[in-house]
Amino acid sequence: VAEVKAQVLMARQFPRDEQMAAEKILRECARPTLADAAVYTFPRGKETVTGPSIRLAEVLARNWGNCTFGYEVLERRQDNRGVGYSVIRAYAWDLETNMYISRQFELKHWRTTKNGGYKLTDDRDIYELEANMASRRIRACILQMVPGDVTQIAVAACRKTASSGLAEKMADKEQREKLISATVRIYE
């Protein structure tokens, strides 16, 4: 409780500068690695679903400032068939405005396959499933917390970076080596 009070107090003492936060977000969106991973796309039925990725949402929250996000496994149980499930809460909290957004969900410890599926019993498999599914809910919470226009501008900036050809140039081994040696010279 004391740690949370301290975080809220610090956030109110040092409020975010929205202009500076937006500039930091745009600087990060100029990075080819983020730009390439900024938007997810997957087929759902006859349509294609797209949106800001989990990685972009994390960048938005980190640079927006005065907020925290994550997930908690509230409990693990077994159903009447012996299949385990977790109750999980994903959240994003703007400490400055005290806006707390959460999503609570139940997650069956089950891996679906083309031939049906099987229950998960290995702790690592269960943890990875929880983390993966919680990340999607965290993204939704962050995108609800950060103003929509900031998100739209970030997505547009990432698309511009990705389409500028900069990503391809950075992938070129020779370009990477030049960048590394130039960076080394700066710090020598």
Task: Show the residue positions of the predicted features.
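Polyanion-binding surfaces on beta-sheet-dominated domains and ring/shell assemblies
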Residues: V1-V87, Y91-E188
